[in-house]
Amino acid sequence: MTKKYPKKRFINQVNYTTNRRRKDSTFCLLFGSEACKENALSLYNALSSVPCKAAEELTIYTLEDAVYIKRKNDVGYLVKNDLRLQLVEAQSTINPNMPLHGLIYFAETYSNYIITEEQNIYGSTLVKIPTPQYVVLYEGERDADAVQKLRISDSFEDRSVREEFEWTATVYNLCHKENRWLLDRCRILKEYTEFNERVRKYKKVMPIKKAVDLAVEECIEEGILAEFLKKHRAEVRMSAITEFNQEVYDRSLRQEGREEGIEKSFKLMALLHRDGRQDLADKIITDIELRKKLFEEYQL
């Protein structure tokens, strides 16, 4: 069963109305629908230390309009008998804000779970909630460690209180040889990465639409996601083209940001030398917090 929760906004979510037009990614089509429930079970078991024995025990959770402004690229699984809640995201970039994103997602999901199960969080009895697991599957082109732990405490303005609260996202680099075990445990995930690898390879030498079409044709011929691609060819084609175009757009924004940051840093160094603060001009090269503070001071 797939549970779709109604829209539930936080105070600062008024700008997220575009989410209603958000389309599912190839990843969600493959692992987040009732029609592909066995795929969901395989992925859940590959990532979980406590396996789920049957697809019927697995509930797929989706939030219709939570915290996203792009394409939905994640799926959530609840195994009710074991009270475990797993959120899995597929990403082509490593975003340091993923722990915050995951925290908001889980807060929404827990809120709806408590309502559905008619739990009383204001009573004297301890309310038990599903044990969370938050996983990010990275398959981008940038080199990255096999496994990374991203912590929400890195975002705290006051780092001295980080031990008081923590929320973690575990990032697996699917392109790293040390994570071949994960692909071996979930054949569909392995085939999904193979499809994406082909699209990436072909788009370097041909337009993205032709690259996607060629990857789809080859994978069908070679038995890679064959039945899925035959059935969902149009959706996958549109989704893949959009996703890879989004990657190009995101890279261009990051490049613009780097160039702007370099220009601002040079301006700041010139101003510091003008004001006789040469010692700070040397420090801002490595001290990010000092650089931010001085940007504000000089209104850059």
Give names to the regions the model predicted.
Residues 2-300:
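Elongated, amphipathic alpha-helical interaction scaffolds
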